[in-house]
Amino acid sequence: MKILIFIIASFMLIGVECKEGYPMGSDGCKISCVVNNEYCKGQCSYISTQEDKKWKGSDGYCYFWGLACYCTGLPENAKVWDSKTNKCGG
């Protein structure tokens, strides 16, 4: 029983440490793609979190329905697109 609780707690900690989302370009829009996963992996491995610092995401892929790159394994302070604060095109 203790092992089961430990495993569940471990999964919860892993989920807390990793952020996911759509990376933003300099214009505040999602980075678009069609079916190019390699392009998105490159974009996701070099996400800006501050003006002068870059952080690496663990992986990325082209989300077909959204026609945009989607990144996984990002640090918590990485800037990602959010529909609530969308300033794309404005």
Swiss-Prot record:
Family matches, as SUPFAM superfamilies: Scorpion toxin-like
Domain LCN-type CS-alpha/beta span(s) in chain numbering: 19-89
Tissue: Expressed by the venom gland.
Disulfide topology: C29-C88, C33-C62, C40-C69, C44-C71
Secretion signal span: 1-18
Purpose: Beta toxins bind voltage-independently at site-4 of sodium channels (Nav) and shift the voltage of activation toward more negative potentials thereby affecting sodium channel activation and promoting spontaneous and repetitive firing.
Protein family per UniProt: Belongs to the long (4 C-C) scorpion toxin superfamily. Sodium channel inhibitor family. Beta subfamily.
Annotated protein name in UniProt: Putative beta-neurotoxin RjAa2f
Organism of origin: Rhopalurus junceus
